[in-house]
Each structure stands twice: as C-alpha cells, then as structure tokens.
Amino acid sequence: MESWVFERGSLTRRLKAACGADFNVRVIRQGFAHPFPDEALLLKLRSGRRALVREVELRSRERRLVLARSVLPAQTLKGAGRRLAHLGNRPLGEILFASRRPRRHGFEAALAEDRHWRPAVRAGSGSAGPVWGRRSLYSIAGRPLLVAEFFLPAVLSVPESA
C-alpha cells in the first residue's frame, strides 16, 4: 500500500498502465459547494466561499480502487483552468499532469475512518475499517486546487510494479 500512497507521479497514469482498457472513472457528484473547513483553510478561501467539488471513483471495470475528492476554487477555473470544470468521466490527473508538471505545495497521508463518509460513498467501498488516504495541494498557473485520494482494499490487487 505504501507505494500507492506515496506515489510522486500521476496516480492516474500508474492505474492506467496497470489496468489498461479496464481503467475508468465514475463521477459520484460534482458541483459548487462549500468546502470542508480544513479544505478552505488550505486553499486560503474566505469563509462562505464555494468551490467546485468533484468526487469520483477510479476503477478497474466495476471494481472501485480509489475514491478521490477534488476542490477547485472559482479562480482556478478561469483561463486555462476552465477545462477542469468540464471533465466528465475523464480523470483530473490526465489534465493535471499533461505537458508541464503541476506544482505540489503540500502533501499529507493518514488513515481515514470511513464512518465520516457519506453513506452513498461508503456503500460498496469494500472497506471494513480505516483506509489510507493522501491529500495534495497543487497549483496550476499559480492557482490552487486540492486533491484527496483514498485507497480502497481492491487497489492491493493491482500490480504495484506498474
């Protein structure tokens, strides 16, 4: 699990290499919402500000491997970042790591209790307890975005050498 949590490159690229054509993204929800207080603090958003919040599953066929939550402030969605608001079932990492590497400003890893997740997210996670997660603060063209990824038990069946 450690190599997944501490992957320094594109998690999307690594999963695609390991899963091939079976890799896919399912959007759980996406829309403007109030970020969690700790997310707003990391993104330096003023109280009450909304951001684009996107929650997805990264999967191999129907098997859920990773749950991801991205928070993109409105300022990040301007100019070249406009395309980030219209990803559909495309993975954020595909855009984030395209051409120039994004700048990572912070990284955190921790065990996350699934009891804090919404029931719709928790259902079918395959988790019977805490899962490893990581959170990274990136910037694209000087504008921030926050990405959190939670590694579900099924990710252990994906070859780590990919």
Curated annotation (Swiss-Prot):
InterPro entries registered for this protein in UniProt: Chorismate--pyruvate_lyase, Chorismate_lyase_/UTRA_dom_sf
Record EC number: 4.1.3.40
Pathway assigned to this chain's UniProt record: Cofactor biosynthesis; ubiquinone biosynthesis
GO molecular function terms noted in the UniProt entry: chorismate lyase activity
Reactions performed catalytically: chorismate = 4-hydroxybenzoate + pyruvate
Membrane found in the keyword field: no
Binding positions for substrate per the UniProt entry: 54, 92, 149
GO-annotated biological processes: pyruvate biosynthetic process; ubiquinone biosynthetic process
Gene Ontology CC annotations of this record: cytosol
Family annotation (SUPFAM superfamilies): Chorismate lyase-like
Subcellular localization: Cytoplasm
KW Lyase (keyword) present: yes
Coarse class of the protein's main subcellular location: cytoplasm
Key words, A-Z: Cytoplasm, Lyase, Pyruvate, Ubiquinone biosynthesis
Family of the protein in this entry: Belongs to the UbiC family.
Protein purpose: Removes the pyruvyl group from chorismate, with concomitant aromatization of the ring, to provide 4-hydroxybenzoate (4HB) for the ubiquinone pathway.
Name this polypeptide is given: Probable chorismate pyruvate-lyase
